[in-house]
Amino acid sequence: MICRATGILTASFAFFALAGSVVAHADEQRHHALSLIGEPQYGPDFKHFDWVNPDAPKGGTLRIAALGSFDSFNAYSIKGEVANGVGALLYDTLMDGSLDEPSTAYGLIAEWVSHPDDISSVTFKLRDEAKFQDGEPIKVEDVIFSFKLLKKINPSYNKYYKNVVSAEKTGDRKVTFSFDMKGNRELPLILGDLPVLPKHYYDGKGKNGKVRDPEKTTMTPPLGSGPY
């Protein structure tokens, strides 16, 4: 689990040193952040976003106001009415945007990101310390599972990732997404927004003895990777 609250990169997360802004390594360049507009505001060694209070109290109960009701904690199925905030608060993404600069994202689950000059693909290297809430490490298999699952069960994600033709494990902690086009600088950021779901959780069985179905509604709080 990497500490984050509604997209906030906290001091707890930033304690882990980010990879260099651009670090040459063989035939790849590693980036700690990606931006469509100029250079990222924060360097590779920043401790927290300027608008974050690293000394803010931690713990307690978070209450979120919402209109209406809900009948599901499954944030990604098209069925039912999902509880407000479930997706953003329960699941971390490969990268996370800052609230004080546009079109820029920093590594969250991903330690660094790289892509060739023609942007025909993008590679994310996962942090060794990234874990789900049950202590299981976040693996490349979880990333690939999440990508394929979201495309399958949710038309919005299927459209969102329409230019992504494959997701492959390309190293012990590396996953590479290949595109059907070149030169689109936004595609790496789109993949960075991928929420990562636990494959082992959905491969397992619930208290009713049945395999958990990610397409159905559920009132059982799911296993996530975020701070709540």
Question: What does each of the following model-derived ranges do?
Answer:
Residues 1-4:
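N-terminal secretory signal peptides that target proteins for export/translocation
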Residues 7-20:
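Bacterial N-terminal signal peptides
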Residues 20-26:
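Sec/Tat signal peptide C-region and signal peptidase I cleavage site
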Residues 26-118, 125, 148, 221-225:
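N-terminal lobe/hinge region of extracytoplasmic solute-binding protein
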Residues 52, 77-86, 112-156, 170, ...:
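Aromatic- and charge-enriched surface segment that lines or borders ligand/interaction sites
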Residues 91-103, 193-228:
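Gly/Pro-rich hinge or "lid" segments in bacterial periplasmic/extracellular proteins
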Residues 109-114, 118, 133, 138, ...:
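Aromatic-rich, solvent-exposed beta-strand/loop patch
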Residues 125, 159-207:
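Surface-exposed binding/hinge segments that line
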